[in-house]
Protein backbone atom coordinates (compact mmCIF):
# COMPACT_ATOMS: atom_id res chain seq x y z
CA UNK A 1 0.00 0.00 0.00
CA UNK A 2 1.11 3.53 -0.79
CA UNK A 3 -0.18 6.84 0.54
CA UNK A 4 -0.25 9.50 -2.16
CA UNK A 5 -0.09 13.19 -1.23
CA UNK A 6 -0.47 15.66 -4.10
CA UNK A 7 1.02 19.09 -3.34
CA UNK A 8 0.47 22.34 -5.26
CA UNK A 9 3.44 24.51 -6.29
CA UNK A 10 4.67 26.92 -3.63
CA UNK A 11 3.86 29.99 -5.73
CA UNK A 12 0.16 29.05 -5.79
CA UNK A 13 -0.18 27.97 -2.17
CA UNK A 14 -3.11 28.98 -0.03
CA UNK A 15 -3.91 32.24 -1.76
CA UNK A 16 -6.90 32.83 0.53
CA UNK A 17 -4.38 33.19 3.36
CA UNK A 18 -2.31 35.76 1.46
CA UNK A 19 -3.68 38.78 3.33
CA UNK A 20 -2.84 37.12 6.65
CA UNK A 21 0.40 35.24 5.95
CA UNK A 22 3.30 36.14 3.67
CA UNK A 23 4.32 33.76 0.89
CA UNK A 24 7.24 32.51 3.00
CA UNK A 25 4.94 31.96 5.99
CA UNK A 26 2.45 30.06 3.82
CA UNK A 27 5.26 27.86 2.55
CA UNK A 28 6.40 27.08 6.08
CA UNK A 29 2.80 26.43 7.11
CA UNK A 30 2.58 23.82 4.36
CA UNK A 31 5.84 22.16 5.39
CA UNK A 32 4.66 21.90 8.98
CA UNK A 33 1.32 20.46 7.90
CA UNK A 34 3.21 17.85 5.90
CA UNK A 35 5.26 17.00 8.99
CA UNK A 36 2.06 16.41 10.96
CA UNK A 37 0.57 14.27 8.20
CA UNK A 38 3.74 12.19 7.90
CA UNK A 39 3.64 11.60 11.66
CA UNK A 40 0.14 10.14 11.30
CA UNK A 41 1.37 7.91 8.46
CA UNK A 42 4.23 6.36 10.43
CA UNK A 43 5.08 2.93 9.07
CA UNK A 44 3.45 3.48 5.67
CA UNK A 45 5.12 4.24 2.35
CA UNK A 46 4.37 7.82 1.29
CA UNK A 47 4.53 9.23 -2.24
CA UNK A 48 4.50 13.01 -2.74
CA UNK A 49 3.57 14.23 -6.20
CA UNK A 50 4.29 17.86 -7.11
CA UNK A 51 5.73 19.99 -9.89
CA UNK A 52 7.63 22.07 -7.31
CA UNK A 53 11.29 21.08 -6.80
CA UNK A 54 11.49 22.61 -3.32
CA UNK A 55 8.50 20.56 -2.19
CA UNK A 56 9.96 17.42 -3.73
CA UNK A 57 13.33 17.96 -2.04
CA UNK A 58 11.60 18.46 1.32
CA UNK A 59 9.55 15.31 0.79
CA UNK A 60 12.57 13.24 -0.20
CA UNK A 61 15.11 14.39 2.37
CA UNK A 62 13.04 15.32 5.42
CA UNK A 63 9.90 13.24 5.08
CA UNK A 64 11.82 10.29 3.55
CA UNK A 65 9.01 9.93 1.02
CA UNK A 66 9.08 8.74 -2.55
CA UNK A 67 8.61 11.57 -5.02
CA UNK A 68 6.92 11.97 -8.38
CA UNK A 69 7.60 15.04 -10.52
CA UNK A 70 4.22 16.14 -11.81
CA UNK A 71 4.04 16.38 -15.60
CA UNK A 72 0.42 17.24 -16.29
CA UNK A 73 -2.00 19.91 -15.14
CA UNK A 74 -4.84 19.10 -12.79
CA UNK A 75 -5.18 17.20 -9.53
CA UNK A 76 -6.74 14.10 -11.08
CA UNK A 77 -3.96 13.86 -13.65
CA UNK A 78 -1.28 14.27 -10.97
CA UNK A 79 -2.70 11.40 -8.94
CA UNK A 80 -3.08 9.20 -12.03
CA UNK A 81 0.56 9.87 -12.87
CA UNK A 82 1.54 8.72 -9.38
CA UNK A 83 -0.58 5.59 -9.91
CA UNK A 84 1.36 4.86 -13.10
CA UNK A 85 4.71 5.18 -11.32
CA UNK A 86 4.00 2.87 -8.38
CA UNK A 87 3.63 -0.90 -8.38
CA UNK A 88 1.23 -1.12 -5.43
CA UNK A 89 -2.47 -1.61 -6.09
CA UNK A 90 -3.86 -0.47 -2.72
CA UNK A 91 -3.65 3.28 -2.20
CA UNK A 92 -4.73 6.02 0.16
CA UNK A 93 -4.95 9.56 -1.21
CA UNK A 94 -4.91 12.51 1.16
CA UNK A 95 -4.37 16.25 0.64
CA UNK A 96 -1.43 18.19 2.05
CA UNK A 97 -3.52 20.49 4.25
CA UNK A 98 -5.15 18.23 6.87
CA UNK A 99 -2.68 18.53 9.78
CA UNK A 100 -5.18 17.27 12.38
CA UNK A 101 -5.20 13.74 10.97
CA UNK A 102 -3.96 11.21 13.55
CA UNK A 103 -2.37 7.78 13.50
CA UNK A 104 -5.59 6.40 15.03
CA UNK A 105 -7.49 7.47 11.91
CA UNK A 106 -5.06 5.58 9.69
CA UNK A 107 -5.26 2.51 11.92
CA UNK A 108 -9.05 2.62 11.55
CA UNK A 109 -8.76 2.85 7.77
CA UNK A 110 -6.38 -0.11 7.61
CA UNK A 111 -8.77 -2.25 9.66
CA UNK A 112 -11.75 -1.23 7.53
CA UNK A 113 -9.82 -1.92 4.34
CA UNK A 114 -10.15 -5.65 4.98
CA UNK A 115 -13.91 -5.41 4.39
CA UNK A 116 -14.35 -2.53 1.93
CA UNK A 117 -13.23 -1.66 -1.60
CA UNK A 118 -13.42 2.09 -1.04
CA UNK A 119 -13.28 4.22 2.10
CA UNK A 120 -13.89 7.94 1.95
CA UNK A 121 -13.81 10.91 4.33
CA UNK A 122 -15.18 14.30 3.33
CA UNK A 123 -13.97 17.82 3.84
CA UNK A 124 -16.28 20.37 5.44
CA UNK A 125 -16.86 21.85 2.00
CA UNK A 126 -17.87 18.62 0.28
CA UNK A 127 -14.45 17.66 -1.04
CA UNK A 128 -12.58 14.41 -0.45
CA UNK A 129 -10.00 14.55 2.34
CA UNK A 130 -9.20 10.83 2.41
CA UNK A 131 -9.80 8.18 -0.21
CA UNK A 132 -8.79 4.53 0.17
CA UNK A 133 -8.97 2.32 -2.92
CA UNK A 134 -8.37 -1.42 -2.80
CA UNK A 135 -7.20 -1.11 -6.38
CA UNK A 136 -5.88 2.18 -7.73
CA UNK A 137 -7.91 1.99 -10.94
CA UNK A 138 -11.13 1.02 -9.19
CA UNK A 139 -12.95 4.26 -10.02
CA UNK A 140 -12.57 7.34 -12.16
CA UNK A 141 -11.03 10.05 -9.98
CA UNK A 142 -13.23 13.13 -9.79
CA UNK A 143 -11.42 15.53 -7.51
CA UNK A 144 -12.31 19.23 -7.37
CA UNK A 145 -15.78 20.58 -6.74
CA UNK A 146 -18.05 18.40 -4.60
CA UNK A 147 -15.79 15.41 -5.10
CA UNK A 148 -17.10 13.54 -2.05
CA UNK A 149 -20.48 13.04 -3.73
CA UNK A 150 -18.87 12.36 -7.10
CA UNK A 151 -16.68 9.62 -5.65
CA UNK A 152 -19.67 8.05 -3.89
CA UNK A 153 -21.48 8.12 -7.22
CA UNK A 154 -18.55 6.28 -8.80
CA UNK A 155 -18.62 3.66 -6.03
CA UNK A 156 -22.36 3.07 -6.37
CA UNK A 157 -22.14 2.91 -10.16
CA UNK A 158 -19.62 0.08 -9.84
CA UNK A 159 -21.43 -1.72 -6.98
CA UNK A 160 -18.40 -1.35 -4.72
CA UNK A 161 -18.42 -2.06 -1.03
CA UNK A 162 -17.76 1.40 0.39
CA UNK A 163 -17.57 2.99 3.83
CA UNK A 164 -18.00 6.64 4.76
CA UNK A 165 -15.46 7.45 7.47
CA UNK A 166 -16.83 10.35 9.49
CA UNK A 167 -14.09 12.41 11.14
CA UNK A 168 -14.22 16.08 12.03
CA UNK A 169 -10.43 16.24 12.36
CA UNK A 170 -9.90 14.85 8.87
CA UNK A 171 -12.55 17.21 7.51
CA UNK A 172 -10.56 20.28 8.58
CA UNK A 173 -8.44 21.52 5.69
CA UNK A 174 -6.60 24.80 6.04
CA UNK A 175 -7.53 27.40 3.45
CA UNK A 176 -8.62 30.57 5.30
CA UNK A 177 -7.57 32.52 8.41
CA UNK A 178 -10.63 31.18 10.24
CA UNK A 179 -9.51 27.61 9.51
CA UNK A 180 -6.41 28.36 11.57
CA UNK A 181 -8.69 28.65 14.60
CA UNK A 182 -9.40 24.92 14.39
CA UNK A 183 -5.68 24.28 14.76
CA UNK A 184 -5.57 26.25 17.99
CA UNK A 185 -8.54 24.35 19.42
CA UNK A 186 -7.79 20.83 18.20
CA UNK A 187 -4.10 20.88 17.27
CA UNK A 188 -2.19 20.51 20.53
CA UNK A 189 1.24 18.93 20.06
CA UNK A 190 1.26 19.51 16.31
CA UNK A 191 4.03 21.11 14.31
CA UNK A 192 1.39 23.32 12.71
CA UNK A 193 0.07 24.83 15.93
CA UNK A 194 3.57 25.40 17.28
CA UNK A 195 4.54 27.17 14.06
CA UNK A 196 1.47 29.42 14.09
CA UNK A 197 2.00 30.32 17.75
CA UNK A 198 5.56 31.27 16.88
CA UNK A 199 4.19 33.78 14.36
CA UNK A 200 2.24 35.50 17.12
CA UNK A 201 -1.14 34.30 15.88
CA UNK A 202 -3.94 34.25 18.44
CA UNK A 203 -7.51 33.00 18.31
CA UNK A 204 -10.51 34.31 20.22
CA UNK A 205 -14.15 33.15 20.12
CA UNK A 206 -16.57 35.18 18.06
CA UNK A 207 -20.02 35.64 19.55
CA UNK A 208 -21.92 36.12 16.32
CA UNK A 209 -23.33 34.16 13.42
CA UNK A 210 -20.50 35.33 11.15
CA UNK A 211 -17.95 32.64 11.89
CA UNK A 212 -16.63 30.95 15.01
CA UNK A 213 -13.31 32.71 15.59
CA UNK A 214 -11.43 35.93 15.48
CA UNK A 215 -7.93 35.09 14.27
CA UNK A 216 -5.37 37.85 14.71
CA UNK A 217 -1.65 38.51 15.00
CA UNK A 218 0.13 40.20 17.84
UniProtKB/Swiss-Prot annotation:
Gene Ontology terms, MF aspect: GTP binding; phospholactate guanylyltransferase activity
Associated pathway: Cofactor biosynthesis; coenzyme F420 biosynthesis
Keywords of this entry: GTP-binding, Nucleotide-binding, Nucleotidyltransferase, Transferase
InterPro entries: CofC (IPR002835), Nucleotide-diphossugar_trans (IPR029044)
Catalysed transformations (reactions): (2S)-2-phospholactate + GTP + H(+) = (2S)-lactyl-2-diphospho-5'-guanosine + diphosphate
BP GO annotations: F420-0 metabolic process
UniProt EC number: 2.7.7.68
Keyword ATP-binding: no
Keyword GTP-binding: yes
Similarity comment: family membership: Belongs to the CofC family.
Name of the protein this chain belongs to: 2-phospho-L-lactate guanylyltransferase
Gene from which the chain derives: cofC
Amino acid sequence: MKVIIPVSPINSLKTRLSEFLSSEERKNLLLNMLRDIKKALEGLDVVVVSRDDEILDFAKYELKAEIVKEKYKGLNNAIKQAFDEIDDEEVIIIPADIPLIKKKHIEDILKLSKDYDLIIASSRGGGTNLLYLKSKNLIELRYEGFSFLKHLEEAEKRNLRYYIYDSFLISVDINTPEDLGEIFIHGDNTYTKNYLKGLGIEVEPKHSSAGRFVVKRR
